[in-house]
């Protein structure tokens, strides 16, 4: 598989690589509700972005979400030491915890991140595969939900010119490529 595949006339790119190195206006962090960093993508973003991101996340926890960021919601911080100007933090659903709303919550992660991006003048954004790691969301179902949410948003919005879907492993990118709904 190539390192990059285009969808929707180049507005959506499927990329294999490191999300912390993407040259975009904003990257999305598949965060945990504490917003204090963790493993996987969350830890990598906090490590690469430096202490400024953590400081802003702590302030958000203190003033806006003292009980933690709810699943499906999104908040924005500086990009710190990252190439991206912003990091948009969103918490995906933990698979099996809320069966009635899992798909809705996962779609909301993408929708709310894109809305927040538009509000901050973001023209390019990179997403990881939200909830498919430690949160256990099935990758095929997640690919369908993510691609539908992104397609629907871009169909109604021309401000965001490029969305990158960044996968660390080729096998995950292959699943997305096979099951997307663009």
For the regions a protein language model found, what residue spans apply to each?
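Macrodomain-like recognition of ADP-ribose-binding/processing modules
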Residues: 1-182
């Amino acid at each position: 598989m190539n390192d990059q595949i285009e969808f929707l006339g180049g507005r959506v790119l499927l990329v294999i690589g490191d999300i912390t190195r993407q040259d975009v206006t904003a990257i999305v962090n598949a965060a945990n509700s504490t917003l204090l960093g963790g493993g996987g993508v969350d830890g990598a973003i906090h490590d690469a972005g430096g202490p400024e991101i953590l400081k802003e996340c702590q302030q958000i926890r203190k003033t806006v979400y003292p009980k933690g960021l709810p699943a499906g919601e999104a908040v924005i911080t500086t990009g710190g030491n990252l190439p991206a100007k912003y990091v948009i933090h969103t918490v995906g659903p933990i698979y099996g915890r809320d069966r009635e709303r899992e798909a809705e919550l996962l779609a909301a992660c993408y929708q709310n991140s894109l809305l927040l991006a538009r509000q901050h003048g973001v023209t390019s954004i990179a997403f990881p595969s939200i909830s498919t790691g430690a949160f256990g969301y099935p990758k095929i179902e997640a690919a369908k939900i993510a691609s539908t949410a992104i397609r629907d948003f871009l169909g109604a919005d021309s401000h965001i010119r490029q969305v990158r879907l960044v996968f660390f492993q080729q096998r995950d990118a292959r699943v997305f490529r096979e099951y997307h709904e663009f």
